[in-house]
Amino acid sequence: MNKKLNDVLLKLDQDLIKYVKGSLDLEISGVTYSSKLVLPGFVFFALPGIRFDGHDFIEMAIQNGSNVIVHSRDMDFYSPNVTYIKVDDFSIRKFMSNFSNVFYDEPSKKLKVIGVTGTDGKSSVCYYIYLLLKKKGVKVGFISTVFFDDGSGSLIKNPYRQSTPESTEIHAFLSNMVKNGVQYAILESTSHGLDLKTARLIDVNYFAAVFTNIGHEHLEFHGTIQNYLNVKLGLFRSVSDDAGFGVINLDDFYSSEFKNAVKKSFTYSLKSSQADFFVSFIDEKIDSTRFEFYYKGVKYFANVNLLGSFNVENVMAALILVSQILNSDIQDIVDKLVCIKSLDGRMDSINLGQNFSVIIDYAHTPGAFSKLFPIFKRFATNRLISVFGSAGERDVAKRFLQGQISDIYSDLILLCDEDPRGENSMCIIKDIAKGIVNKVVNQDLFFIPDRKQAIEKAISLARAGDLVVVLGKGHESSIIYKNREVFWNEQEVVKNAILSLEKEK
């Protein structure tokens, strides 16, 4: 896809541009913020960052073939045959999003984009919507923390460390969906992605939105819970007024604000019969859940191969969304719930014939802990052993809450690394331990920063009937330290620990 630079610039907000130095009569072939990804004819956006400054990589970008540099700081030297566009520091990400959107011919306007937001459950809801739409024969694509599908029909693992990619990648991916004939695009819309500070999603046109819940998360980025809430409300406010709608969890404290943010909405609840869709009964088993719900006075009976009432919430959100966008009979969607399966790293049960149970889950917020731990305790026929940590350089206040919740339900707790980043591992662990008051260190509470060693210790302590839960990483393929990332595969580490234990017997 090639464009004339001037043709793109003419469609952008000229107030964002401080000056242009060089020719506008250039052909551009791509957009990126990574000098490593630059190809001949690419526009390079020199983004300022926390650890790295894109301005330090301008020379490399030019060497790799970039002919247009978008920057926000004064240059000491201007290379000939390269065009420089200067914008303000605070608007460079907005400009990058605007530019990418226009370069790729505003792809979201050619799709019906469904945004899913909330603290917990986003990835699962996206995946369930995706599976149900595919089962209905609809051409669908999606972008989530775990998987991508550009409409080619094959799932690929999210290659980026953040849940929501940068705007250059978002619009490129949406453009591929258009080329592949996608009708509906499901987009996991995180608070980071929705925030104007990152501007990753500001040029996406949303047809419908789903709200799962609000909990204690990302306050290190947003500052206050109100800021965090407002960012998510922005998604609902942006939904198309004509045919668009929202799907809202009525059980959440902030549900009324989301209802007020969108013209048309459908609510679901596990507690209130005032919801449009009311779940009146849930019967949980270790590998499946049966539930009943009402809609417009009609009672429906449903069964899913998933564990937990939280998954009933996620399934209801997906069911409502799909039934409404396709104007389908509710029973028809209920019948297709058997196609739903869990995501990688979500309630993964590891069974290699051992006499105890092991579950891996991505849960890493107090909200997720409060939903999962009662379920874990209920299904542990003997002791509950918990292995988890908390992210470094992220919301510090949640650490105490994670410790407090785990303390109530767990018999043994092993604290370890999640992603310490630039923080000291033991400091993070001790922050979590402040919430743990009913355990004794080195008796039923262990501080083991090395996650592999912590998992191996937990497996070695497990007895017949115990349930070991390993939380916080799930599908993630690395552990982030200050100056390095270490490859990680939670499932393999757990399996190897179990196999090693069996060999010792």
From Swiss-Prot:
Carboxylation is probably crucial for Mg(2+) binding and, consequently, for the gamma-phosphate positioning of ATP. It is an enzyme of class 6 (ligase). Transmembrane segments: none annotated. GO terms for molecular function: acid-amino acid ligase activity; ATP binding; magnesium ion binding. It is found in: Cytoplasm. UDP-N-acetyl-alpha-D-muramoyl-L-alanyl-D-glutamate binds at S35, S163, T164, T190, R200. Its EC number is 6.3.2.-. Catalyzes the addition of an amino acid to the nucleotide precursor UDP-N-acetylmuramoyl-L-alanyl-D-glutamate (UMAG) in the biosynthesis of bacterial cell-wall peptidoglycan. This is UDP-N-acetylmuramyl-tripeptide synthetase. The gene is murE.
